């Protein structure tokens, strides 16, 4: 299954280096100069390969690799004027560089959303090592929407499994539980 390319950051195997004591780093867009930079003063969490059609993916990748960090730990530190929200109607407001198109971070503004307070980040845009490694794959079937033939899906899922990235056609069970818990709390069923 090694011939199925997922994403450059995981195609050679998921690296499980030391994350102990890692306190974050800086993300940079791909422009040659006047780079947008975003400081993330926190370790990432829930890092995963995402097959949705909205996340930024490097050229040729079927999946993005995306994680979350606390919103209050994510700060644009250079060239904020180059950032534009990709789709203002989307739940996740993805802030992309107008120069190179890279998504620097995604933010949820709906305070009632289960993931409010978490910003979505692409740790591959950082020179620092120590970020949490990808641990699963989400929205796997969605890669069909971006052109992957359905008859290749068994191979894609097998490759994800081979890489240790359990494939889900939604989010991981822990994240789905968080979404459902949030709904139940808003209904007054849980406290």
Curated annotation (Swiss-Prot):
Family to which this protein belongs: Belongs to the Gfa family.
Example GO biological process: formaldehyde catabolic process
A matching Pfam family: GFA
Parts of the chain that traverse the membrane: none
SS bonds (residue pairs): none
Encoding gene per record: gfa
This enzyme's EC code(s): 4.4.1.22
Protein function: Catalyzes the condensation of formaldehyde and glutathione to S-hydroxymethylglutathione.
PANTHER family reported for this sequence: CENP-V_GFA DOMAIN-CONTAINING PROTEIN-RELATED, GFA DOMAIN-CONTAINING PROTEIN
Entry note: cofactor: Binds 2 Zn(2+) ions per subunit.
UniProt keywords, alphabetically: Lyase, Metal-binding, Zinc
Domain CENP-V/GFA: 22-169
Cofactor(s) the protein needs: Zn(2+)
Pathway it works in: One-carbon metabolism; formaldehyde degradation; formate from formaldehyde (glutathione route): step 1/3
Catalytic activity: S-(hydroxymethyl)glutathione = glutathione + formaldehyde
One of the record's GO molecular function terms: S-(hydroxymethyl)glutathione synthase activity
Name under which the protein is recorded: Glutathione-dependent formaldehyde-activating enzyme
Positions contributing to Zn(2+) 2 binding: 50, 52, 55
Positions bound to Zn(2+) 1: 29, 31, 97, 100
């Amino acid at each position: 299954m090694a011939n199925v390319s997922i994403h450059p950051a995981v195609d050679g195997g998921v690296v499980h280096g030391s994350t102990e004591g890692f306190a974050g780093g800086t993300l940079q867009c791909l422009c040659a100069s006047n780079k947008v930079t975003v400081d993330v003063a926190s370790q990432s969490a829930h890092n995963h390969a995402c097959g949705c059609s909205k996340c930024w993916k490097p050229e040729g990748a079927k999946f993005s690799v995306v994680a979350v960090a606390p919103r209050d730990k994510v700060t644009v530190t250079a060239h904020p004027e180059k950032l534009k929200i990709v789709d203002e109607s989307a739940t996740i407001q993805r802030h992309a560089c107008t120069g190179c198109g890279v998504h620097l971070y995604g933010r949820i503004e709906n305070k009632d959303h289960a993931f409010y307070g978490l910003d979505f980040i692409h740790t591959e845009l950082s020179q620092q090592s120590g970020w949490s490694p990808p641990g699963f794959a989400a929205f796997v079937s969605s890669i069909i929407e971006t052109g992957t033939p359905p008859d290749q899906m068994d191979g894609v899922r097998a490759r994800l499994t081979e890489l240790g990235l359990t494939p889900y056609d939604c989010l991981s069970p822990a994240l789905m539980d968080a979404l459902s818990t949030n709904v139940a709390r808003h209904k007054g069923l849980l406290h």
